[in-house]
């Protein structure tokens, strides 16, 4: 093996298959771009993003780990969210939960 060498799997990988999804319209009402990472608790994102935060509680973006979605100023787009997995405890972010969901 060579350091950094990759051994990709054959075929197509399907992410988060079978997970419940929530679709929300999100608008960036601010004057700067906002970027949200794959595992960020979506309900606690930048206040310039306008959407139903109650529906996003306990959810994250349905995108590949380590990637992000960027919202340009004035942009409106639909996002697909999935429930945060594991023990469903959230700490940090904007400190709006700080414990179990």
Swiss-Prot record:
Subcellular location: Cytoplasm
Superkingdom of this protein's organism: Bacteria
GO MF, one example: urease activity
Record's keyword terms, sorted: Cytoplasm, Hydrolase
Pathway: Nitrogen metabolism; urea degradation; CO(2) and NH(3) from urea (urease route): step 1/1
Signal peptide: none
Family matches, as InterPro entries: Urease_beta-like (IPR002019), Urease_betasu_sf (IPR036461), Urease_subunit (IPR050069)
Main subcellular location: cytoplasm
The protein's Enzyme Commission number: 3.5.1.5
Catalytic activity: urea + 2 H2O + H(+) = hydrogencarbonate + 2 NH4(+)
Gene3D superfamilies: Urease, beta subunit
Matching NCBIfam families: PRK13203.1, urease_beta
UniProt subunit comment: Heterotrimer of UreA (gamma), UreB (beta) and UreC (alpha) subunits. Three heterotrimers associate to form the active enzyme.
Family to which this protein belongs: Belongs to the urease beta subunit family.
Name of this chain's protein: Urease subunit beta
GN (gene name): ureB
